[in-house]
Every structure is written in structure tokens, then in C-alpha cells.
Amino acid sequence: MARHHALRLFLACGSLALILSCNGGSSHTGGTGTIQVHLTDAPIDLSTVQSVTVTITGVLVYRGSDTMMPQVDDGGSIALVTHPETFDLLTLTGGATTLLASGEVPAGSYQRIRLEISSATLTYKDGTEAALKIDSNKVDIPIPFHVAVDQTSTMTLDFDAAASVQVNDTASGSLILRPVVTPVGMGS
């Protein structure tokens, strides 16, 4: 377990160093580049669970030096996904990833990504399903990155199912989704 946390810390620090080294220059350079956002899930021990599915209805990237992460869209966002797509997080362990979003965006600096989640379901191995109450349908991920002209930037987000699914002790044991999403890789 400690080795898993050490590996995750190493990956996060390495990703941060890579991101910071690629973050020079002005916030807008003219032209466009492409951003690809991939999704993965760290290995978990949910021995009675068959799947944890989430429906993502939006992936937005935010430009500029916005560090306040407003709760409403301030007009500085660019939508990469505008239609719902459902992902089973438990199929994304052991290094597996899936393309979450891809799109052409103005070249320049970006400060964060937002995932918008409309629903989530946990399915047990016996086939019974439990709807997960979503604590917040918006997940802001502060991650400065740069998209260069005529280049493709790629990042991977770890949506940690084990840390995200919680039991509500005060409301008859209902299940809650409190998304824990961490950037684990960035490249061009």
C-alpha cells in the first residue's frame, strides 16, 4: 500500500515538473493546437463490485491565469465534450486508459479542466445496482498546461473509484460519489 502511494506521489511530482517546464511564454500565441484528455483509474480492492460507471456530459478547459475556479462558467472555457458518454472506471485499471475528450483549441496556456458528471452507478457482482448520489456534478482539476501551435498535447486523469465512492453513515448507508480526480500524466 505504501509503495502504491509512493508511486502515485512520484507520478504526480513528475507530471507537475513536466507541466511547469512546458508552461513558458505568453498565454495566447495565435493559431491552434489539439488537446487530448485520457481517463484511467488506479487499481482498487472492491471485491464485491463489478463496475462503477459515470456519465460525463462535459469536459471543459479554462484559459488564462484564473486560479479562483469560479462555480459558474465565466466565459473563459472551451468545451471539448458536449454530449453524454458513460465510462466504467473499473475497466480502466492496470495502466488502461480511454479517450475522454479531444478537440482543437486556441494555442496558449490553460489553467484547469472541468468534468461535468450527470450520473453514476455501482453494480455489484450479483447484478444488483445502486445509484450513486453525486455530491457535486462539477469537478474542477487545477492543472496548468500549454497547447502549442500545430501540436497535440495529451494528459491523463486518474478518476479514483475507490476513493470517490463513499458510504453515507447518516442516511441509511446510501452511496455517494465524491469524485477524486488527479492528473497523472502530461505530454506532447
Regions found by a protein language model. Name each.
Residues 18-21:
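C-terminal motif of bacterial Sec signal peptides marking the signal peptidase cleavage site
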Residues 23-188:
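A short, solvent-exposed, low-complexity linear motif enriched for acidic/polar residues
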